[in-house]
Amino acid sequence: MENQPKLNSSKEVIAFLAERFPHCFSAEGEARPLKIGIFQDLVDRVAGEMNLSKTQLRSALRLYTSSWRYLYGVKPGATRVDLDGNPCGELDEQHVEHARKQLEEAKARVQAQRAEQQAKKREAAAAAGEKEDAPRRERKPRPTTPRRKEGAERKPRAQKPVEKAPKTAKAPREEQHTPVSDISALTVGQALKVKAGQNAMDATVLEITKDGVRVQLNSGMSLIVRAEHLVF
């Protein structure tokens, strides 16, 4: 008994219990709910083995029953087992609800710890970015152009073609017209022009009336035009 190795951590104790009582404890996967009062059964069964103390057994049991995989196993309809895997009664609703709350709290703590770690990493990265500026690249010296030897013939520089300014198109000369001052001087068949805005259309006198002069345009259309719209 003196040469038995000593278990130093709660995880090592749990591994020992899973090997010693495989129908009760498990080292991985979903765990089965334990019998109420199983601590005393452990003390009676493993007293002196592996130099285990009551304190070690109690700490290992606390770690085992607070693990997520054990809390997942505490659910409605599950049955408690003793050290040999024998059923020891079904879980009551109070214990199931307590395990559910413990699991939710454990998950919340883990999420809070992860969020805090991420925040610290971001702060550290931001602080490092402010303190350390990116090193500037050194400018490479410009290559020196070799000097022209004395007496060497200088190459003529290529002359750039001179671009000629585009000629501005001359505005067409406006045709000068003489306004008709007296329509009584006009004769039938006389050629003249009818002003329409800035343009003047060719026309022929058909008739002289009291309202104006009836003319015929080159298009064949005839109309009466007043004197101020007629020019030669």
UniProtKB/Swiss-Prot annotation:
<dbReference type="Pfam" id="PF17516">
    <property type="entry name" value="ProQ_C"/>
</dbReference>
<dbReference type="Pfam" id="PF04352">
    <property type="entry name" value="ProQ"/>
</dbReference>
<dbReference type="GO" id="GO:0033592">
    <property type="term" value="F:RNA strand annealing activity"/>
</dbReference>
<feature type="compositionally biased region" description="Basic and acidic residues">
    <location>
        <begin position="117"/>
        <end position="136"/>
    </location>
</feature>
<dbReference type="InterPro" id="IPR036442">
    <property type="entry name" value="ProQ/FinO_sf"/>
</dbReference>
<dbReference type="GO" id="GO:0005829">
    <property type="term" value="C:cytosol"/>
</dbReference>
<dbReference type="GO" id="GO:0034057">
    <property type="term" value="F:RNA strand-exchange activity"/>
</dbReference>
<keyword id="KW-0963">Cytoplasm</keyword>
<comment type="function">
    <text>RNA chaperone with significant RNA binding, RNA strand exchange and RNA duplexing activities. May regulate ProP activity through an RNA-based, post-transcriptional mechanism.</text>
</comment>
<keyword id="KW-0143">Chaperone</keyword>
<dbReference type="InterPro" id="IPR023529">
    <property type="entry name" value="ProQ"/>
</dbReference>
<dbReference type="InterPro" id="IPR016103">
    <property type="entry name" value="ProQ/FinO"/>
</dbReference>
<feature type="compositionally biased region" description="Basic and acidic residues">
    <location>
        <begin position="147"/>
        <end position="177"/>
    </location>
</feature>
<dbReference type="InterPro" id="IPR035236">
    <property type="entry name" value="ProQ_C"/>
</dbReference>
<dbReference type="GO" id="GO:0010608">
    <property type="term" value="P:post-transcriptional regulation of gene expression"/>
</dbReference>
<protein>
    <recommendedName>
        <fullName>RNA chaperone ProQ</fullName>
    </recommendedName>
</protein>
<comment type="similarity">
    <text>Belongs to the ProQ family.</text>
</comment>
<feature type="compositionally biased region" description="Basic residues">
    <location>
        <begin position="137"/>
        <end position="146"/>
    </location>
</feature>
<keyword id="KW-0694">RNA-binding</keyword>
<feature type="region of interest" description="Disordered">
    <location>
        <begin position="105"/>
        <end position="182"/>
    </location>
</feature>
